[in-house]
Amino acid sequence: MSDENPLQPPWLNAPPVDSYPYEESHDLRTGPKLHPTLDGLLPYIGVWRGRGRGGYPTIEDFDFAQEIRISHDGRPFLCYESRAWLLDEQSRPIRPAGREMGWWRPVLDGDRATNEWEALMSTPTGVMELHLGKRTGTQLEFATDAVVRTPTAKEVTAGHRLFGIVEGALLYAQEMAAVGHGLTPHLSARLIRVGG
């Protein structure tokens, strides 16, 4: 008769595992080969850093700095990570600001990418957004299809984002519908490539 407890999961006493064995890269010169369905977003892959301006009817306008990292691991999606920090009038950091994680995925027709894209975006403030959009050249435009919030999150009901690569820089504008307001400009920034 076995000494194993049938109610105990088999991994409970298993030895530790090594670190994650697969590479993720924001640099197309190293790491895994880019999945062919992502070729249309190749210019976005990298680490971007720059400045922007934000505001909303319920808050004062503010200046911020931001770093965006767009990477891949060889599969048919991109990983999007963003972190921002507020700046004072002399461009000195004041405090951390928005953070966001997400994934950009092409809509496929068989095994080929179309110009349609899906984006899943999540913030630590309890808001998750599902965006649907299209790529035109080096421009991506997304609009929310659904917004999910935790019970304690601020009321966000819709969003619209426009990204573009212009003269080698990453530019974006973001509109948000929240706390009783319709879609209203919220953030815009210009970031330059610092890695990748």
UniProtKB/Swiss-Prot annotation:
Heme b binds at H186. It comes from the Bacteria. Pathway: Nitrogen metabolism. InterPro entries: Calycin (IPR012674), Nb(III)_bact/plant (IPR022939), Nitrobindin (IPR045165), THAP4-like_heme-bd (IPR014878). Its EC number is 5.99.-.-. Pfam families: THAP4_heme-bd (PF08768). It catalyses: peroxynitrite = nitrate. CDD domains: lipocalin_heme-bd-THAP4-like. Signal peptide: none annotated. Forms a 10-stranded antiparallel beta-barrel structure able to accommodate a hydrophobic ligand in its interior. In fact, this fold hosts the heme group, which is located in a wide surface cleft. Belongs to the nitrobindin family. This is Peroxynitrite isomerase. It comes from Salinispora tropica (strain ATCC BAA-916 / DSM 44818 / JCM 13857 / NBRC 105044 / CNB-440).
